[in-house]
């Protein structure tokens, strides 16, 4: 192949949060570009691609290969088994049919959903040797998988399959409190801090058959109806959050059991955590504090959108040159530091759109609403402008060298620049 560049297009669509990525595998796995469809369509968590995102992807072409993040025939088999006959039998629900309208006429390789998740984490991680845990609502069939990563190769060790799913359980309670399942779980996580976990044991008794291996008593894909109709939604949120943390703690311990005894290869206990459930930063902090692992890597986009990168890495079995999540559309110009400071001093708030867009669900400074945290009014001001609930959390931004003066991070977490973990404030500090 000589010096010819080999560029691969990775695609995730036809599920929540469609995305595309371009990777140059001849240049050390450089991620040239990666973006969410929603950034172009303005439809939150858009399931489908659009002409605008495809056009931008094509500026990085031509492509030597197109890779898709899951296996649609397996997925349709599960949909048929679950009674979703309309989805299972509709040929328009096949990804290639969707892609053809944008001039993409072939998919060269299909990588399984959970392998894409696992590869997203492993091949962007700083580890050669680790255990990889993937937890989400559902892939084709898998809902939980454990892999051993060693010297650039992944080996599947254990899997749990549909309908037994921690992600589906959490989504069922998202729906129960009036939120949108498979989209607004992050709001449920925020609600949990305002309630008490008084229903945790009841949820476990009524819905869970066993914690390890994880088994549900019923298929909860369609929700739990109006279970406990008089319960305070905040208490329901707190209860399912606390139970989820317990279930994940069991899984982290189970994953750790696959690590070999300490050796030259496995000198430290390293975890890669992926899948949509890995976005639960409150749970991540509790779990990190248990000290099960020495080092933890959660790729900043561990959900389905990130698998547009992971499917390529899995296909090539190659580490990627991961530097940061600023991989999307570029708004050129010097970052307006002085203008931001002036705006914050005068009006307490400032919107920023500069540089390359974040690839992932968190606003990390390039597409962000910034606010001065001092004073009692700013919380309500931000919530009003964003049209969101009063209980929603905020992400502090601080110089890395000052973090430990103001915040207490979980055990084994040195910093958290991408919102994978939460931190406790150190009391008595003057802001």
What is each of the regions a protein language model found here?
Residues 1-5:
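Short, Lys/Arg-enriched N-terminal segments with co-localized hydrophobic residues
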Residues 8, 12-44, 79-82, 86-92, ...:
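Flexible beta->alpha loop and helix N-cap segments adjacent to enzyme active/binding sites
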Residues 37-62:
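N-terminal phosphate-binding loop and adjacent alpha-helix
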Residues 61-74, 108, 263-276, 351:
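Short glycine-rich phosphate-binding loop at a beta-alpha junction
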Residues 228, 232-236, 240, 244, ...:
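Secondary-structure capping and boundary motifs in well-ordered enzyme cores
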Residues 238-267:
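Phosphate/ATP-binding catalytic cores across multiple sugar-kinase/actin-like superfamilies
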């Amino acid at each position: 192949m000589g010096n010819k560049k080999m560029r691969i297009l990775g695609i995730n669509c036809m599920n929540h949060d469609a995305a595309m990525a371009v990777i140059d595998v001849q240049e050390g796995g450089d991620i040239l570009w990666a973006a969410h469809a929603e950034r172009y369509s303005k439809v939150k968590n858009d399931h489908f691609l659009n002409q605008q995102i495809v056009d931008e992807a094509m500026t990085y072409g031509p492509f030597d290969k197109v890779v898709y993040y899951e296996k649609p025939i397996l997925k349709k088999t599960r949909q048929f088994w679950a009674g979703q006959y309309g989805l299972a039998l509709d040929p328009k629900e096949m990804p290639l049919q969707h892609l053809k309208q944008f001039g993409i006429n072939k998919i060269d390789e299909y990588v399984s959903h959970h392998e894409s998740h696992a590869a997203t984490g492993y091949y962007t991680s700083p580890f050669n040797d680790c255990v990889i845990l993937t937890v989400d609502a559902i892939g084709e069939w898998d809902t939980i998988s454990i892999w051993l990563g060693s010297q650039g190769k992944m080996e599947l060790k254990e899997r749990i399959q549909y309908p037994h799913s921690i992600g589906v359980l959490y989504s069922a309670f998202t729906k129960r409190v009036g939120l949108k399942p498979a989209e607004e779980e992050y709001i449920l996580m925020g609600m949990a801090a305002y309630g008490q976990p008084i229903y945790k044991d009841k949820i476990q008794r009524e819905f869970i058959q066993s914690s390890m291996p994880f088994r549900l008593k019923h298929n909860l894909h369609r929700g739990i109806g109006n279970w406990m109709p008089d319960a305070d939604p905040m208490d329901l949120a707190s209860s399912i959050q606390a139970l989820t943390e317990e279930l994940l703690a069991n899984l982290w311990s189970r994953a750790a059991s696959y690590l070999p005894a300490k050796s030259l290869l496995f000198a430290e206990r390293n975890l890669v955590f992926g899948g949509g459930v890995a976005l639960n930063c409150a749970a991540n902090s509790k779990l990190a504090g248990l000290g099960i692992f020495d080092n933890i890597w959660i790729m900043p986009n561990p959900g389905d959108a990130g698998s547009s990168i992971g499917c390529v890495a899995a296909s090539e079995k190659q580490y990627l040159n991961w530097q940061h999540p600023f991989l999307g559309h570029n708004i050129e110009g010097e970052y307006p530091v002085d203008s931001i400071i002036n705006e914050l001093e005068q009006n307490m708030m400032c919107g920023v759109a500069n540089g390359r867009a974040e690839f992932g669900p968190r606003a990390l400074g390039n597409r962000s609403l910034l606010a001065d945290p001092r004073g009692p009014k700013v919380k309500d001001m931000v919530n009003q402008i964003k049209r969101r609930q009063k209980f929603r959390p905020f992400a502090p931004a601080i110089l890395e060298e000052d973090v430990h003066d103001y915040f207490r991070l979980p055990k084994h977490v040195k910093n958290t620049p991408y919102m994978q973990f939460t931190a406790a404030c150190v009391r008595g500090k003057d802001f």
